[in-house]
Each structure stands twice: as structure tokens, then as C-alpha cells.
Amino acid sequence: MAKTTTPPKKKVKKKKVLSADEKGKLKREKKLHADILSFFKTSGFEYISTNGKEKKFGTIPGELDGVYFYKNVIVIIEETIGSDNDHLRTKVDYFQKIKENKEEFLQWISQLAPDKFGFPTEYTTARYHLIYCYASETLVSEDISERYPEVKFLGPLILKYFLHLARSIRYSSRNEFFKFLGLGHSDIGDASSSTQPRYIDSAVIVPEAGTGFPEGINIVTFVMKAQELLDCAYVFRKDSWESAIGQYYQRLVDKSKIDKIRSYLASSQRTFIDNIVVTLPEGTSFTKLGADPHPPEINIKDLSSISNVQIRIPYLINSIGIIDGQHRVFGHYHGGDHLEKEIARHRDRRHLFVTGILYNSDKYKESDKRIFESGLFLLMNNNQNKVKPDLLQYIETLKSPRSSLGIAGNVLMTMNNRDPFKNLFLLSPLDKVGIKTPTIVKYGLQGLVELSVEKETIFKYWVNDNKLKLLDERYDESLYQEYIKFCAVSLSQYFNGLKSQYKDIWDLSNKNSRILTSTAIVAFLKSYASALTKYQEVNDFLFFKDKFEKLTIEFTKDDFSQYGSSHWPRLAARIDLECWV
């Protein structure tokens, strides 16, 4: 009988055991990818998986983390949780080769996902827009973003914003994302549908006269279709991707409110009678309705004395600014929910009453417009749905930038971009973790940065020959920004001196640490004023590092319990006693 031999057992490859750091990194990578995927899919883009698929374009081989497309708009995504600038430069070089070999790229993604993306399509190769987005877990510095202007940087706050927007208004969030990408209506879809200028025409119901508004602001009432507003409207949300440039004042869209309005629209079969308040774009014109096919334009000042007037508004993406009524407009959003079929029947037929504000561009620059609008927004909203303290402070900062509150708000936002408070302040409801700011601004910063040479303020000790010009009504904006930066740098050096003594507990995730609480920060700001009084000058990091070595306070949960939420005077007195002697 032949002897049987047992085949040798295959060696089972042991699964690599990940360290805690590796597990944490993997978890963060998965979270970033899931958020990006969720945004694009919720807003109506198709996804093509390219991760792990190497492809050479020109002379450069490389990989892409993902490709998303809508019609002729293709977004190439790079996902990273690191901050390797050389890695970014390599990726940008690779993207440039993709653009140079566009048709080859389109054929490649068609081969990867033929069921989603067939090529050739109804669009010519030239009609496709290829846009490179760098999605990072951490903020990219200004130097880097300026070095690569062709890249759209999808930082953590911007991604959170668009994800929130997409979850609230689904496909209608695309319009704002297109603006972020630098695209307009004419760039999207078939070129034949975008060669001629489009307009929104409507009969003027009431040309408002005697409104009491300042000269150069004109008011007119008319109707618009919900679809037209969805296509052309934008909102100056404080927490949006554009908020870094300032002058934005509105709240985030509220998903629960949108859902309630959407249910009402679907069940009631009627529109709202409350007016949507908007700003109208440049290029808006007025003509008299009649037999003349080419009627002459009417000056807006003459509207109140003329009947049968038509308003003509350019049909442009993100051109009509909503001051009040964003939820009533976006309740009509495009989306794949169970109400979409009913809403879609009325979106292009249902008219909304609109009150439009038209500015004289010779008298109103953009910052002046936002100041007027933010005041109007507060007037219309604060009584019916109380504005939160942080947004209220922010709006006051816009309205009165040279007030102590206005300066304090701008200083705090500047400090949030610097160590030791970089990205630690809670400036947006999109942030779940952070240091709350209203108390810090009101009780800590406001008095310290005031434009006063009589009080113990940073302004008093600011060495600048031109500083008194800030007290004039016609002040120099660059001088104002110089003072904001001086305050932020000086206070950052002060708190960096403090951090050098408490670096082990300078961490928001440390549940036993109380050094990054509003109470502690207000106390240290009040003590900074005491240091100004004693030393009669603004000191630097090394000075404060040396002084804080004397501090014996332990900012632990138990030790800090004696200093309640508003007991900063006691804490400030102890800091004064131990440090400024």
C-alpha cells in the first residue's frame, strides 16, 4: 500500500498588530474619507474609486485618492492627515500632467467605472473642468495656499461647513460648492445652454418710497420663483468657507427648521406670504412694460411715479444675497428625500414675495453693505429667534469695528490663528470642542484693547507715532489692522510665557486641566492689565516666561474648584500677587 504524504501546512501570515498611534492614524484617515464621501454623495456627485490604482500621465506616475463628478465638473481629491509640503508639491505636479493629458485621464476613469462614467460623452474634452482639491485634517498655512493658487484647499472647517450644508439642503448645496470651486452657471453642463445671458424678469409690485433708509439704498418688492432663488441665492453665513475675509454675519442653516418648512410646503400646497429680503446684484435694471420690444431703462429713483414696471435680474450663480428668509427658500431644495416628488412639482411654479435692496455702488463699498445688512438682520431676527451671544458680538464687531467690543472680537479671531491658542477658540457651531469666547471678549479683552490713552490699555502703551489717527472718524484701515495684530501678538507672547510653565496640561482633551477655561483666561487678561500698570510697557515672551515661573497655582480640577465661573477677580488677584512683585 502506497504511503500517503500529508501536504505541508501553509504558513498563515500573521496579521500585523497595530500600535495605538497607528490605530489612531487609521481611524482619522477613515473619518476624513467618510466625511468627504458623505459630502459629495449627499450633494449629488458620483464617486469613482481610484485609490491604490497607479497611473502614469506624461512622465509622472502617481495615484489619486478619489474622483467625484457632476455633469462636466470633475473634482480630484487628495486626502491627508499630515502636513508634508513636499508631498503636496509632488501631487500638484502630477495634477498638472493630468490636465495636460485630459483626454487620456477621461478615458482612464471611464475604464475604471464604465457604469458611471462613459467616455466619450455629450461633452467635448475641452468642456470638462478638472479641479484639484486638497482635503486636509489640519489647516494649511497661508503661505502654502498662496504658493498653489490652482489648488482648492478643503480644510477641516470648510469640509465641516459643506457637510452640514449638504445634509441640510442636499443637491442644492452644489451651487455654493461651485462658487468655492470658482465656477458659474455657464461652466456647468452643455455649452449650448449657456452661450446667451439669462435673466430673471418680474413685475414690480411695490417700488418703495420714503423708507427712511440712508441715501443710496433703494427698496423694491416683486416675486420670484423658488427655483430661481435656489439657483442664484447665497447667504453671508458667519461660519462659511468665505468667513475668513470678514463682513459675514448670518447663522448656519438649521436642518430641523428646513425639514419642518419642507413638510409644510409639501402638505399645504401654498407658498409663504412673508417677504424674503435680499440684496440685488449689479446689473439689475428696470423697464416699463408695454408694446415697445426694447424699452429704455428707468432710473430706480423714478420708480415710485411709474406704473407697470419690470425688474430684470442677471441669472447668475450666487448673485442674490439673502438677508432674511434663507430657510423659506432652501426648504424647496433639490434632494432625494420622500418629499422630493411633491416639492419638485412646485419648485419652478411657486412664487415667493421678495423685497430687494439695491445699492448705489458709488456710495456703498462691500464692507458698508454688510454693516447695513447685519443691523437689518438683527432687527428682524433678534426678537423672534434670539441671536446667540457669540453671533451678536460678531455682528457688533462688523457694525462698530473701532468700538472696544469690535476690536476685542477681531483680536480674539487673530489670536485663534496663532500659538498658543491656534484653533482652540470655539468660533463656530460646527466646532464641537473649544474654548467659549463671549465671556472672554466681554470681560477680558474688551477693556484691555480699548482705544484709550487714559485707561490702562494696550493702546496706551502701543509705540506708534500715528496711533491717535485711529480716534478719527476717517481712520486708516491699515493702521487699524496694525493695532489688531499688535494686540494679538502681544497677548500671544504673554500666554506663550504661561504655556511654557504649564505645557503638560495645555490641552483641551485633558479633562483634569482648567487652564484653558474662560474663567482662567479672563483672569489672566485682567492680570495683564495689572502688569501694564506696574511696568508701564508691553513686555515680551521671555519677560513673562520668567515671571510665570513664580506661579504656584495648580490648574487641576480640584485645585481650581475655588474659582467659580465668575470668580476671575480672585484668581487675577492671586496671579498679581505671585507674579508682579
Question: Model-found features: residue ranges?
Answer:
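Accessory terminal alpha-helical modules
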Residues: K3-K13, G58-P61, K71-V75, T80-V581
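Acidic-basic catalytic patches of nuclease active cores, encompassing PD-(D/E)XK
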Residues: M1-I60, F69-Y70, Q107-A113
